Swiss-Prot record:
It catalyses: 2-formamido-N(1)-(5-O-phospho-beta-D-ribosyl)acetamidine + ATP = 5-amino-1-(5-phospho-beta-D-ribosyl)imidazole + ADP + phosphate + H(+). One of its GO terms (molecular function) is phosphoribosylformylglycinamidine cyclo-ligase activity. Disulfide bonds: none annotated. NCBIfam families: purM. It is found in: Cytoplasm. InterPro entries: PurM-like_C_dom, PurM-like_C_sf, PurM-like_N, PurM-like_N_sf, PurM_cligase. The keyword Nucleotide-binding applies. It comes from Lysinibacillus sphaericus (strain C3-41). It comes from the Bacteria. Its main location: cytoplasm. GO terms for biological process: 'de novo' IMP biosynthetic process; adenine biosynthetic process. This is Phosphoribosylformylglycinamidine cyclo-ligase. The keyword Ligase applies. Keywords: ATP-binding, Cytoplasm, Ligase, Nucleotide-binding, Purine biosynthesis.
Length: 351
């Protein structure tokens, strides 16, 4: 091989080795509808295998934001791919889509096959958890654009559902019950604030065990817990009950995301104390001296996904969610108005 490209900072052989390492991870995501073989110029999927009468494709793209910086600091790269898949898949599931396939994009300052394999392993783990196939992607070595130990990660998810089954929120009415599904932690939003509080202002080391928060373990790892994937519990709920609307609680927290599913003239009324707030949020509130409004405007506060359904259907929704291994809580209701209204306090209900 010519050394000219390598002298410019691009190691082609390392790229080939990374692709070899990816193969087994990609193959375990295979599902009905996948066509072609690993390494083709484009990923292919046979939509006819789904037997949908009026199929509608629903797509989403996203990244992981500055949570990547934390992965660099901890030097842990095998779960950040789960975050990438979750950020894309949870959005399309909120509109009723069954995830079908996923494509990833990794841009690095230096191609390190072992690190790339760990990143793609996480992506594949997320695909397996959500039922999507990893049918393509791009790994680009970009010396001069990224530092040698840095990378960026983004993805693109495509799902499908019957045209008649699209979840738009248009059917939400006053009196509908709001069912929240538990989050696993901070997920993938708010990390610029997290890093400022924890590492800039408080100057904790990533492996620090913080006094009075010893139960969290090393703080860096507690903050790296991957985003929960909601595809299976939410799709089960959509089959089991008459669901009127869904919201993925991502950037902007409750204040921005719950109104996204609401028809004009309706608001969400949230009962604080109706679910356990995760300890990691108590830690961030304490160390960052944050007001409650800031918390609910940035973080998921322990609820990563919200379903709106008629009161008579709420038990069916909760049973379907919990049958798929997730915790569900009745957290409020739909009222006349606009935005989000909070009632009560959490009364120290922390886990």
């Amino acid at each position: 091989m010519s050394k000219a490209y390598e002298q410019a900072g691009v190691n082609i052989e390392a790229g080939y080795e990374a692709v070899k390492r990816m193969k087994s991870h990609v193959e375990r995501t295979n599902r009905l509808g996948v066509m072609g073989t690993f390494g083709g110029f484009g990923g292919m999927f046979d939509l006819s295998e789904l037997n949908l009468k009026e199929p509608v494709l629903i797509s989403g793209t996203d990244g992981v934001g500055t949570k990547l910086k934390l992965a660099f600091m901890v030097d842990k790269h095998d779960t950040i791919g789960v975050d990438c898949v979750a950020m894309c898949v949870n959005d399309i599931v909120a509109q009723g889509a069954e995830p079908l396939y996923f494509l990833d994009y990794v841009a690095l300052g230096k191609a390190e096959p072992a690190k790339i394999e760990q990143i793609v392993k996480g992506v594949a783990d997320g695909c397996v958890q959500s039922g999507a196939a990893l049918i393509g992607g791009e790994t680009a070595e970009m010396p001069g654009l990224y530092e040698e130990d840095e990378y960026d990660l983004a993805g693109f998810a495509v799902g499908a559902c019957e045209k008649s089954a699209i979840v738009t929120g248009e059917r939400i009415v006053e009196g509908d019950v709001l069912i929240g599904i538990a989050s696993s932690g901070v997920h993938s939003n708010g990390y610029s604030l997290v890093r400022k509080i924890v590492f800039a202002d408080r100057q904790y080391a990533v492996d620090a065990i913080v006094e009075n928060y010893e139960d969290l373990g090393p703080i860096g790892e507690a903050l790296l817990v991957p985003t929960k994937l909601y595809a299976k519990p939410v799709l089960a709920a959509l089959k089991a009950a008459d669901v009127h609307g869904c919201a993925h609680v991502t950037g902007g927290g409750f204040y921005e995301n719950l109104p996204r599913m609401m028809p004009e003239g309706l608001a969400t009324e949230i009962d604080l104390g109706s679910w356990p707030v995760l300890r990691i949020f108590e830690f961030l509130k304490d160390k960052g001296q944050l007001e409650d409004k800031d918390l609910y405007n940035v973080f998921n506060m322990g609820i990563g996904f919200v379903i709106a359904a008629p009161a008579a259907e709420a038990d069916k929704v909760m049973a379907a969610v919990e049958a798929n291994g997730e915790k569900a809580y009745t957290i409020g209701r739909v009222i006349k108005g606009n935005g989000v209204v909070f009632n009560g306090t959490h009364d120290g209900s922390l886990v």
